[in-house]
């Protein structure tokens, strides 16, 4: 089986690797994004871990690298998982850069996450002559795990991104709504984004998750009470890995994008 072969190779050659996936993201009016992501344990701590998360995204011949470090700790008889993380994001074609920080609270019934993004790079000119500027921003996300045997979740998120230049008033605010489901080694997600810049769109992704043998859990009992979430210790941080930019044309018109 493909997953077992990849898992065996990773465990033999990368002992610290705890999670690995390959993903295809689809969004209306944009070309697809292909990505690979891994979570690697740096150090075990009491009822927790210190870890590294690395991902590489390819969108429209544009690559973005995300390198993050975080800590997670299990509390309350392993029914609550708290975490904090920090990231550095680098987009290669225009050399956009930013840093980010996040916190998370994870249970068997619901999860809450918050992320902040701070642009480091200034104005850049892309290959079409358009000026781009990485944006500052934040997002909040809540996931509810449906009380059924299948691994199905619904989520809602809010976000705000803005041009950090003091002379600019450009801002993107909005919400995302969606659901995801785990089917064997595949994770399927779909939803809708609604924002204030007429950039509303449907989105979806399909992710192939390599089975390392630590993420399987029986969900057939205690569906409405808090249960052990130690199986989520190495799940990836949920954040926006592509760098949002504001695009400024020669006429002065502005638009958001990646």
Please report, for each region that a protein language model flagged, where it lies by residue:
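Outer-membrane beta-barrel initiation region
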Residues: 1-63, 249-258
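Residue-identity detector for threonine
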Residues: 33, 49, 54, 64, ...
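Flexible, glycine-rich linker and terminal segments associated
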Residues: 1-12, 120-155, 159-168, 182-187, ...
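Solvent-exposed loop/turn segments connecting transmembrane beta-strands
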Residues: 25-34, 56-66, 90-97, 164-173, ...
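Extended interaction regions within the primary functional domain
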Residues: 13-29, 43-49, 69-78, 84, ...
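Transmembrane beta-strand segments that form the barrel wall of outer-membrane beta-barrel proteins
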Residues: 18-26, 47-58, 80-91, 101, ...
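Feature captures outer-membrane beta-barrel proteins of Gram-negative bacteria and organelles
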Residues: 8-10, 32-45, 63-77, 99-116, ...
């Amino acid at each position: 089986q493909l997953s077992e072969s990849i898992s065996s190779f990773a465990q033999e050659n990368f002992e610290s690797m705890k999670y690995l996936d390959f993903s295809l993201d689809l969004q209306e009016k944009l070309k697809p994004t292909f990505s690979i992501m891994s979570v690697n344990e740096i150090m075990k701590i009491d009822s927790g871990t210190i870890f590294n998360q690395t991902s590489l995204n390819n969108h429209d011949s544009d690559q973005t690298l995300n390198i993050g470090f975080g800590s997670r700790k299990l509390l309350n008889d392993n029914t609550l998982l708290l975490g904090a993380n920090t990231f550095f994001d680098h987009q290669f074609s225009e050399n956009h850069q930013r840093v980010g920080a996040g916190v998370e609270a994870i249970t068997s019934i619901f999860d809450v996450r918050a992320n902040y993004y701070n642009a480091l790079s200034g104005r850049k000119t892309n290959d079409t002559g358009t000026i781009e500027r990485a944006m500052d921003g934040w997002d909040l996300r809540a996931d509810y795990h449906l009380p059924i045997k299948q691994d199905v979740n619904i989520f809602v998120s809010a976000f705000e991104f803005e041009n950090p230049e003091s002379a600019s008033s450009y801002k993107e605010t909005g919400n995302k709504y969606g659901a995801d489901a785990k089917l064997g080694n595949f994770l399927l997600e779909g939803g809708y984004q609604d924002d204030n810049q007429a950039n509303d769109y449907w989105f979806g992704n399909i992710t192939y998750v390599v089975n390392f043998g630590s993420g399987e859990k029986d969900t057939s009992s205690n569906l409405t009470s808090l249960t052990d979430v130690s199986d989520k210790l190495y799940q990836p941080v949920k954040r926006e890995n592509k760098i949002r930019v504001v695009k400024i044309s020669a006429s002065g018109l502005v638009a958001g994008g990646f």
